[in-house]
């Protein structure tokens, strides 16, 4: 099964390496704001800068579109948070995430 969020106006970005796609994500522009979402990197490509390249590609696209504010939501303390911070994002707030198993 293939599942992909179908967000109106979403710009999908992919990073190639090693003969195929290794990372992908979206930039959703709306009213001057850009939302970075759905980041994914193949496990075999992790730790080699793929997500950073993905973030930088969307930053360039956002600048071309004239967006004035960019947002992303990531798990606190993880690799994605560190990558976004290195690319110039700052933490605006933290929020609780809840999980439950279905039995």
Where are these regions (language model features)?
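Conserved acetyl-CoA-binding loop-helix of GNAT-fold acetyltransferases
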Residues: 38-41, 47-64, 82, 86
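Residues that form or flank phosphate/diphosphate-binding pockets in enzymes
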Residues: 49, 79, 93
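Conserved acetyl-CoA-binding loop of GNAT-fold acetyltransferases
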Residues: 85-94
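A conserved beta-strand-loop-helix scaffold within acyl/acetyltransferase catalytic domains
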Residues: 1-44, 93
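Non-catalytic surface loops within mature trypsin-like serine protease
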Residues: 17, 43, 76, 102-103
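Conserved GNAT acetyl-CoA-binding A-motif
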Residues: 62-74
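Conserved beta-strand-loop-alpha-helix junction that forms the acyl-donor binding cleft
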Residues: 71-81, 99-102
């Amino acid at each position: 099964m293939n599942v992909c969020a179908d967000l109106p106006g979403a710009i999908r970005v992919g990073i190639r390496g090693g003969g195929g796609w290794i990372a992908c994500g979206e930039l959703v522009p709306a009213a001057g704001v850009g939302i970075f979402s759905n980041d994914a990197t193949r496990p075999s490509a992790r730790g080699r800068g793929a997500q950073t390249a993905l973030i930088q590609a969307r930053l360039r696209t956002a600048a071309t579109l004239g967006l004035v504010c960019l947002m992303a939501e990531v798990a606190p303390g993880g690799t994605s948070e560190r990558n976004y911070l290195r690319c110039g994002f700052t933490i605006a707030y933290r929020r609780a995430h809840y999980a439950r198993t279905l039995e």
